[in-house]
Design a protein with these regions (language model features):
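Enzyme catalytic cores with a strong preference for nitrogen-chemistry domains
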Residues: 1-348, 359-388, 426, 431
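ATP/NTP-dependent adenylation/nucleotidyl-transfer catalytic domains that generate, transfer
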Residues: 155, 214, 225-226, 247, ...
Length: 670
């Protein structure tokens, strides 16, 4: 039996953080060596970080990445390793994976298919390498190495690459690599988290290993790398159609290795037995780069306990989406806190669902970090903070790093005041009350004197609502500034779609953790957190005080009985309209037709009113979406104009389409 010990690593990197990124890669090398690993696959662009954006066009970025690569070479003795970096070749930047073997740079594989949809803008920074093309890349010392569409023969073991997006396309490179008889396909990836996406990855890794008759190593990034995208890790190793090792997801560690023992003879004989396998005997030998390597010496290292971790029980349960949401946002918040070197989090806790959800997620960030890293690990991660409690537990850490404030005006009620206090107490947050009624009254007096008339709800409704939200902004910002904390805003995606928020009021903040998720899911998730909660952490029964309420902005006088859904439409309908109109790009008439069978409890005429309301509010409020604080990417329905959904600030507002809708709705019998 010809056995190799292989590993795929997930790394929590930071764009342009040269010291940390290099140390983290070195740590992966050291752990792999200690485990007796001879083949190690690291993530895409791991030396620079994936999210460098326009810094990929900085000569400094390219030089430092190359220097880091050269610095790592001696540490790869006795191993075959791949690391990702940008490479400037013939005045074009390519997204490359460098293959290092026994202390030498063997070659550079350039990515063939660039990710240019969703949050990805790779074609802005990189050029796609053409299939079948091989060149020589000049090194600073005057020597050259192969670059391009390469595969490798390292001491008789053959390696090929699919770099992230390469594996997601129909004509993936693996088919040609199979013809060259490769033993391993290495996939260094930077695949951001989205709900359910792990299952897609598993399918192409498994199918690639089966169809190509290879062992497939999939490495990924981990954590909140650059602010918006969350990477869940989840390394995968498959061989001949079987998943042989999986790594855990949403880890708070800097890195994790997933390892496996691979029987090289078994995979080769599998290819030999396959009637459909056709070796490419006339293939271009220039594409195969050969390097010497002593596998006998490499495999003589004693193999110790493997460091790969199986999927947690939460991934097998019935609440996978709820668990993914909780763990993804918790990890993203913790990483944002430490990478921004902030003093904590500050939050205006209104007593409603959105701010309660944000507070719970902050507490979950601390709970998750402590559960995995323990006291010493959390202190190390938060070493920028001068003062942490002597005894670290979830409650003491939340008390130290989360400040909440309830800010009532004369239109606030005891229900929300009591709910805010109850949630803060249950979570352990430091809770304050800032009564802004006098500030609110002061603005009304100033404006009424200026315009020469009293303001009235019948004629000045929006202005009177918005000023209440805006007077809450200066005080909560001041609290955040006192401790150098991140102010968290609480708008959700449903509100962002229709602009149901006060700019410079409840949108105030440095980070908007839930702006990527819809209100309907948030309400469901809060009920789940009240009764069930994530595996290993449990429920928060105190959320019952939130879940009993109907969502309300609480900006009109108490007698008005204001609710969000009266102002807008039912939230489940709003989310369905948003998906049809924005994600799927249907016209107003088409959206109206789609909604009728989905919501038969409402008349066609009423649905037409709500569909028109959505399109009007959507078009009118793009300027607000442009100004929202950065939010986390969670699925394919994101409205972030910087990374996902671009829309003109000024447009025709669907006037012609909505006229057609009104005519059609008017002709339908009621």
């Amino acid at each position: 039996m010809n056995t190799l010990h292989v590993a795929a690593a997930v790394l929590n990197q930071t764009p342009l953080d040269w010291r940390h990124n290099l140390e983290n890669v070195r740590g992966a090398f050291a752990e792999a060596r200690a485990l007796g690993v001879s083949v190690l696959c690291l993530p895409e662009l791991c030396l620079t970080g994936y999210g460098c954006e326009d810094a990929f066009h900085s000569a400094n970025t390219l030089r430092r990445a190359w220097s880091a690569l050269i610095e790592l070479l001696p540490e790869t003795r006795g191993m075959v390793v791949t690391v990702g970096l940008p490479v400037l070749h013939q005045n074009a930047v390519f997204n490359c994976a460098a293959l290092l073997a026994d202390g030498k740079l063997v070659g550079l594989v350039a990515k063939r298919h660039l990710a240019g949809d969703g949050i990805h803008y790779e074609p802005r920074w990189f050029k796609a390498w053409p299939a079948g093309v091989v060149d020589r890349h000049a090194l600073p010392d005057g020597t050259t190495v192969p670059i391009g569409d390469l595969h490798f023969d390292v001491g008789g073991v053959r390696f090929g690459f699919e770099i992230c997006e390469d594996a997601w396309v129909a004509n993936r490179p693996g088919a040609a690599l199979a013809g060259f008889g490769v033993d391993f396909i290495l996939n260094p990836s930077a695949s951001h988290f989205a709900f359910g996406k792990i299952e897609v990855r598993k399918r192409f890794v498994l199918e690639g290993s089966r169809a190509f008759g290879v062992t497939y190593l999939y490495a990924n990034l981990l954590g909140n790398e650059a602010g918006r995208a969350i990477y869940d890790g989840g390394a995968l190793i498959a061989s001949s159609g079987k998943l042989v090792a999986t790594g855990s997801r949403f880890s708070f560690q800097d890195r994790l290795l997933t390892t496996a023992q691979i029987d090289l003879d078994a995979t080769r004989m599998g290819q030999a037995r396959s009637a459909s396998f056709r070796p490419d005997l006339a293939g271009d030998n220039a594409a195969c780069v050969r390097a010497e390597f002593n596998w006998t010496a490499a495999t003589q290292v004693k193999v110790v306990a493997q460091s790969s971790e199986p999927n947690g029980p939460w991934e097998e349960g019935e609440f996978v989406k709820e668990e993914e949401f909780t763990r993804a946002v918790a990890l993203a918040l913790f990483d944002y806190l430490r990478k921004a070197k902030a003093g904590g989090f500050t939050l205006s806790l209104s007593g409603g669902a959105d701010s309660a959800a944000v507070a719970v997620l902050v507490r979950q960030a601390f709970a998750g970090a402590l559960a995995e890293l323990a006291d010493d690990g959390v202190r190390l991660k938060l070493s920028h903070l001068r003062r942490l409690p002597e005894v670290l537990d979830v409650r003491s850490l939340t008390q130290a790093l989360l400040t909440t404030a309830y800010q009532p005006t004369e239109n606030s009620g005891s229900v929300t005041r009591d709910a805010a206090r109850a949630v803060a107490e249950a979570l352990g947050a430091r809770h304050l009350e800032l009564d802004v009624a006098a500030v609110h009254r002061g603005y009304l007096d100033v404006v009424e004197r200026a315009v020469g008339r009293p303001l009235d709800w019948a004629t000045d409704d929006i202005a009177l609502q918005n000023i209440q939200a805006r007077v809450r902004s200066p005080g909560i910002w001041m609290l955040a500034n006192l401790s150098g904390s991140l102010l968290l805003s609480t708008s959700n995606r449903s509100e962002a779609a229709v602009g149901y928020a006060t700019m410079d009021g409840d949108t105030s903040g440095s980070l908007s953790p839930i702006a990527g998720i819809d209100k309907n899911f948030l309400r469901h998730w809060l009920r789940w957190m009240e009764t069930t909660g994530p595996v290993g952490f449990g429920a928060i029964p105190a959320l019952a005080v939130i879940n009993r309420q109907a969502p309300t902005a609480e900006l009109r006088p108490p007698g008005a009985l204001q609710t969000d859904e009266d102002d807008l439409m039912p939230y489940d309908l709003l989310d369905a309209v948003e998906r049809a109109a924005i994600r799927d790009k249907h016209a107003p008439m088409e959206v109206w037709q789609l909604m009728q069978p989905q919501f038969p409890q409402f008349s066609p005429a009423q649905l037409a009113v709500w569909v028109e309301r959505f399109f009007c509010l959507w078009s009118r409020n793009q300027w607000k979406r442009e100004r929202y604080a950065p939010s986390f990417h969670l699925d394919d329905e994101n409205l972030d104009p910087k990374t996902w959904c671009r829309w003109p600030i000024l447009s025709g507002g669907f006037e012609v389409e909505l006229e057609e809708l009104r005519r059609a709705a008017g002709s339908v019998p009621s």
